Amino acid sequence: MKKLLIASLLVAASTLAHAAGESITVYKDPNCGCCSAWIEHLREAGYKVKPVDSGDMAAVKKRLGVPESLESCHTGVVDGSGQVVEGHVPATALAKLIAAPAVKGVAVPGMPSNSPGMGKMNGKLVTVDFAGKQFSKD
C-alpha cells in the first residue's frame, strides 16, 4: 500500500512539473474580476498566461467548440496542444489535461463558489471533459 501511495505521489508531481511553464491564452470579458483571479491562480501554479480581452465571448466559445451546456465566463487554450479549458478549472486539472493530449477540452460549468478565482476549494470541485464525463475532482 505504501509503495502504491509513493508511486501515485510521484506521478502527480511529475504531471505538475510537466505542466509548469506551459503557456495558455485566456479569452475573457474585460470587466470580469473572477477571470483575473483565475489567471492569477494559474500563474501561481507556474503557467505562463496571456490574457486576451473580448467583447464577444459567445463567438470565442463557438469558434473553440465549447459545448453550450458547459459554458462559463472565460475560455483558455493551451498554446502547445490547442486543448480548451472552460471556466474555473483548477491548475491540477489543467496539468492532467496537458498530460492527456487525446482530451480536446475540460470545463467547470457555471461559476461554482468552491473553484479557483471564486472561492476556497474544498476537494469537491468536479471538472468534466467536453462529453460531460467527470475528468477530475479537486
Language model region names:
Residues 10-19:
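Hydrophobic h-region of N-terminal signal peptides that target proteins for export
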Residues 23-24, 47-49, 80-83:
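Short active-site oxyanion
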Residues 29-36, 51-55, 88:
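Soluble non-cytosolic domains of exported or imported proteins
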Residues 63-138:
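Thiol/selenol-based redox catalytic cores and closely related redox-interacting motifs
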Residues 39-58:
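Conserved helix-turn-beta segment immediately C-terminal to the redox Cys motif
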Residues 1-4:
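Positively charged n-region of N-terminal signal peptides that target proteins for export
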Residues 18-45:
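Local sequence-structure signature of Cys/Sec-based thiol-disulfide redox active-site neighborhoods
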